Amino acid sequence: MNLFVYIAQNPTLTKWFFCCVCTILTMPFFKKPYRKRGISRTPYEWLTYADKCVIELSKSELKPNEEKELPKDIKEDCKTVEEKEKVVPRKPLQSEGINEDDSQKNGELIVLHGINHQAAMLTACGLFMVTSSNTNKWKIAFASFLLGMFFTQFGFQKSERSINAEKLESIEKPENDN
C-alpha cells in the first residue's frame, strides 16, 4: 500500500505507472499480423497440409523405391527433372491476412506491417511523456496519448477494402497497345 501512495505523490512515477498500466491493458488490441515469407504457413495450415499429405500417401500406398506416376499430359511434356519442376509447381495454401509479396510487387510499403504492440506503445508513451511535462495540461497529454496509440495502430496501414479496390481498378483498366 505504501508503494501506491509513493507513486501517487510523485508525478513522474505516476506518469510511468499510468503508461505501464495502459500498455498492459491495450495488449490484446495490438496483434502482430502473421507474416508470410515463401511457403511459410500458419500452424493450422501446416496441420491441414500434413493431413492432406498423409491421406494422399495412404491412398497411393507407394513403396520407397517406386515413383508416383504423373498425369499423361505432363508425362509427354516433361523430359528432364527441371522441366517437371517448372510444369508442376507446388501451390501454397491460402491464408488470411496481408501477403508481403503482393505489397512489394505493387510498390506499396506498409510501414507498420508486423510491428509489435510494445514498439507502438513505446511511441505512444513517449509522446505522452513529452507533452505532459506540465501536469496541469493533463487533458492535452491524455489526448496526445490516445492519438499516439491510434496512429501507431491504424495510421500507416491500408485497409483491406482499399487494397482490394486498387486491385479491381488495375484489373478493369484496359491497356491500349497504340
Swiss-Prot record:
Record's protein name: Meiotically up-regulated gene 95 protein
Gene source species: Schizosaccharomyces pombe (strain 972 / ATCC 24843) (Fission yeast)
Membrane topology of this protein: Single-pass type II membrane protein
Location in or out of the cell: Endoplasmic reticulum membrane
UniProt function note: Has a role in meiosis.
Keywords, comma-separated and alphabetical: Endoplasmic reticulum, Membrane, Signal-anchor, Transmembrane, Transmembrane helix
Transmembrane feature ranges: 13-30
Positions in the Cytoplasmic compartment: 1-12
Any one Gene Ontology cellular component term annotated for this protein: endoplasmic reticulum membrane
UniProt superkingdom: Eukaryota
Predominant place of localization: endoplasmic reticulum
Lumenal compartment segments: 31-178
